[in-house]
Curated annotation (Swiss-Prot):
One of its GO terms (biological process) is lipopolysaccharide transport. The keyword Signal applies. It is found in: Cell outer membrane. Pfam families: LptD (PF04453), LptD_N (PF03968). Component of the lipopolysaccharide transport and assembly complex. Interacts with LptE and LptA. Residues 1-21 form the signal peptide. The gene is lptD. This is LPS-assembly protein LptD. Together with LptE, is involved in the assembly of lipopolysaccharide (LPS) at the surface of the outer membrane.
Length: 839
């Protein structure tokens, strides 16, 4: 029996779970049904933009528009099915027909069409399938599909659509717009997974042809947030540029297993290179990236990174291995006659790097930092960070720290791998500490407001075997015991303070030296007191400048230090050295670093500091400090070591100051913030003993926006430039070095980045890179060329490592990169936010 029902009557009928409501749809559903095999034209793209809800907006500078949000008001019951239509022909046992402005809603799923057919199970009379035809629009949260035909299965909420134009929202951190595309067929499974046949996929705006994936099929796993494209082509401006049988990409912020975009690039030391990274999301808190890497000049390298995060630990393991390096083999063959020390080196190149931090308990922590490379040239040949090419000391350290309310205990093992490239200035190895045991106590609640601080430390120093300099293999080594109790009584008032302090330094050494004829031993014990008196005053006044109210402070400070002289030249130098003199050194109790040299002192430091503080916020606008030390006696303790007990430090040693002049250099420091975007800092130290500048630095930082940055810096250090000269000798000269770096937008989408470091003393550049970056709505590109000083050649002319970095980021899909220059940019452009940085 056929029943023709008008919209008014339809609203009153409720039959077998189908609730019909007569809500006339005033706005027709905009359909964009075009067969999948039809190529896109500009007119079709314009039509698609309307169908997908695209709103052009020139005030949106990046994407030039936005999508209307997809909103669906859910029904009260998720199992309820509601159907609206202008007319219906209903059959109890046959197919029912709905016509005119048909709308079906089940939960948060809505389907619109001009015609619908309802199918029932002949036995149970339940609706098993609803078929929609003509101008079909399929909506659910974050999903829109416009199709020629759709079939919905209400019982398990699955369905499929044909000749589809779709829009799927993504939750990717770098995707600004939802994904959209076309497919000949889309299946929606009961678990909300999707299968797309003969499909395209892009996150560009509908009228933007920048990139798209065209695949035989695309599977989208909703729970895992992963998409897999099979037999896929990457099209750039509709031109096919890459084919891959398998491509995995994320559809949300979660990490996904799968192949990443290929790595491409070029360098003068490795040649052209190609890598195919595979990312393995092993668990929510474990992952691994494997990268087979082909270098045309060297061979095939296998690299990988393993990361983990547990309730107690976090860490990263990096490793690379390249067997039988062709270029390195030629290098060894060409140089082994002149440099016999490289004879027999393996051509297998490798690197391991392990960093771990484990919190066993709230007060017990383990830290590990280990790095090792196969040979002295590995970083020069393979480092992708221009700042690391000239690194010569690789740290290997593990420490276990236990902390209580008043004490800190630490056990540590530490050593370094020292790299010795040929025809470069030799670098001395660093003593190993195997182990170091430390205990530090601090009590600040003693009678008379006194503070007691005590440090006890045991170090077992071991000189590493160094085949490059046999003469150094009889270096002193052995244990050192250090004890340093300090008692101070700070007396604080709002207008100033006075802090008398007394302390003792106790060092004990058990020294051995290995010779060809045997081992020599010696013991040394040293007990030295230190007395100091520190005092300062606080003055302040109100200041009104250019419409802003400030508080200006004036803070004079005096610091008297008395340390008696003890001859220490018999004692080896394990970790002591001269320090660069600046404002911070005015109030130190020891002019040497480390514990092996306790400088004698009878001196008075005097300094003056002034600050400008904004009255409302308390933010510091500016500060300036200047000070000097008046010596009442000559400084007799020398850094040098001699078995005779007598030696004199070389006056040209870096950081060494006159030991006879009556005053120290004048140290000054200034910090000024012109506004929140513009600031300047600088140190200037003038030495009256030489009537010349001892050291200076000036740094400028301008950042009016997140990635609009200009940095400039200049450094000058007396004897800070060690130069290799003929006959393998070296000489110390003043270091003049300048650096300029910038990241600056050239337009809404284009920006430039670059840095340049120049050694004025030697008249050549140390590092430089320059690049341009394009950042649009759905993709970004960066090309960066750079070079860094590597070494001097036989004519003492600079040699460089040259690299070209190419990065292409397809937002919502992945990136193509020759390597990751994020380390370079973060090092040389402070404050820079890298949109390509992996997160």
């Amino acid at each position: 029996m056929a029943i023709g029902i008008t919209a008014c009557v339809l609203s009153l009928i409720n039959y077998q779970g189908l609730a019909y409501s007569a809500a006339l749809i005033n706005e027709p559903i905009q359909a964009c049904v075009i067969a999948r095999e039809v190529d896109l034209t500009d007119d079709i793209r314009t039509k698609f933009a309307q169908c997908l809800g695209w709103q052009a907006d020139q005030s949106s500078p990046v994407c030039l528009g936005f999508y209307k949000p997809i909103t669906v008001t859910p029904l009260a019951s998720p199992d309820e099915v509601r159907i609206l239509a202008d007319t219906a022909s209903f059959y109890r046992t046959q197919r029912s027909t709905l016509s005119g402005h048909v709308e079906m809603q089940q939960g948060q799923r809505v389907v619109n069409a001009q015609t619908a057919y309802v199918y029932r199970d002949p036995k149970t009379n339940e609706v098993t399938k609803i078929e929609f035809l003509n101008h079909v629009r399929y909506l659910e949260p974050d999903r829109m599909m416009i199709a020629r035909k759709a079939v919905v299965y209400p019982q398990d909420k699955s369905g499929e659509v044909e000749d589809v134009l779709y829009r799927f929202n993504t939750n990717r951190s770098n995707a600004l717009l939802p994904a959209w595309g076309r497919a000949s067929l889309i299946k929606r499974f009961a678990n909300q997974d999707y299968f797309l046949k003969e499909a395209t996929y892009t996150t560009c705006a509908p009228q933007d042809k920048a990139w798209a994936i065209e695949a035989e099929s695309i599977s989208i796993d909703n729970e895992k947030g992963k998409g897999i494209a099979r037999n896929a082509k990457l099209r750039i401006h509709e031109w096919p540029v890459l084919y891959t049988p398998y491509l995995s990409f994320p559809t949300n912020r979660d990490r996904k297993s799968g192949f990443l975009m290929p790595i491409v690039g070029y360098s003068n030391v490795g040649g052209a290179d190609l890598g195919i990274p595979y990312y393995w999301n092993m668990a929510p808190n474990y992952d691994m990236t494997l990268v087979p890497h082909l270098y045309t000049k060297r061979g095939l390298m296998l690299g990988g990174q393993f990361r983990y995060l547990t309730s107690k630990s976090t860490g990263t393991f990096n490793g690379n291995f390249l067997p039988k390096d062709k270029a390195f083999g030629r290098f060894l063959q060409d140089n082994e006659v002149e440099f016999p020390q490289i004879r027999g080196l393996s051509t297998n190149r490798w690197e391991v790097n392990f960093v771990d931090s484990t919190q066993f308990l709230s007060d017990l922590q383990l830290n590990v930092n280990f790095q090792q490379v196969s040979d002295d040239y590995y970083l020069q040949d393979f480092s992708t960070n221009l700042a690391s090419v000239t690194q010569r000391q690789l740290l290997r350290q593990a420490d276990l720290t236990y902390t209580t309310e008043n004490w800190t205990f630490r056990g540590m093992g530490q050593s370094y791998q020292t790299l010795h490239p040929i025809n470069e200035i030799p670098v001395s190895p660093v003593y190993e500490r195997l182990p170091q045991l430390m205990a530090r106590g601090y009590y600040d609640d003693l009678p008379f407001n006194a503070n007691f601080n005590i440090l006890g430390q045991y170090d077992q120093f071991h000189w590493p075997n160094d085949s490059w300099n046999i003469a150094l293999n009889n270096m002193p080594q052995g244990p050192r015991f250090h004890l340093n109790p300090i008692l101070s009584v700070p007396m604080m008032k709002p207008w100033g303070y006075v802090t008398p302090s007394v302390q003792f330094v106790e060092n004990y050494y058990d020294i051995s030296r290995n010779y060809t004829w045997g081992t020599s031993r010696a013991n040394y014990n040293l007990t030295i007191p230190r007395y100091s008196l520190d005092g300062g005053l606080y003055f302040e006044r109100d200041l009104h400048l250019k419409g802003t109210y400030y508080i200006q402070t004036l803070e004079p400070r005096l610091f008297y230090l008395r340390v008696p002289y003890y001859n220490q030249t018999l004692i080896p130098v394990y970790d002591s050295g001269f320090m660069i003199f600046n404002v911070d050194q005015l109030f130190r109790t020891n002019r040497f670093s480390g514990f092996d040299r306790i400088g004698d002192a009878n001196q008075l430091s005097y300094a003056l500091t002034t600050r400008w503080l904004e009255d409302e916020s308390g933010a510091e606008k500016a500060n300036f400090s200047i000070g000097q030390i008046k010596y009442f006696s000559e400084r007799r303790v020398q850094l040098c070591q001699s078995p005779t007990g007598f030696c004199t430090d070389n006056p040209d040693t870096f950081g060494n100051l006159s030991s006879t002049f009556g005053t120290s250099p004048v140290a000054s420091r200034a910090v000024y913030k012109f506004n929140p975007a513009w600031g300047i800092t600088g140190d200037y130290i003038w030495d009256p003993a030489t009537r010349a500048t001892n050291n200076a630095d000036l740094n400028l930082h301008y950042q009016p926006a997140r990635n609009a940055i200009i940095n400039g810096g200049y450094s000058y250090l007396v004897n800070g430039d060690v130069t290799q000269v003929r006959n393998n000798d070296t000489e110390n000269n003043a270091l003049h070095q300048a650096i300029l770096s910038a990241a600056w937008p050239l337009s809404e989408k284009w920006s430039g980045i670059g840095a340049y470091s120049y050694n004025i003393s030697k008249n050549y550049s140390m590092m430089s890179f320059l690049g341009v970056q394009y950042d649009s709505c759905c993709w970004a590109m960066r090309i960066l060329g750079g070079r860094t000083f590597r070494s001097l050649n036989e004519e003492f002319e600079p040699r460089y490592n040259n690299n070209i970095y190419l990065q292409i980021l397809l937002k919502g899909l992945g990136s193509v990169a020759s390597s990751d220059p994020s380390g370079i940019l973060n090092t040389y452009i402070p404050g820079y936010y890298d949109p390509f940085r992996r997160r």
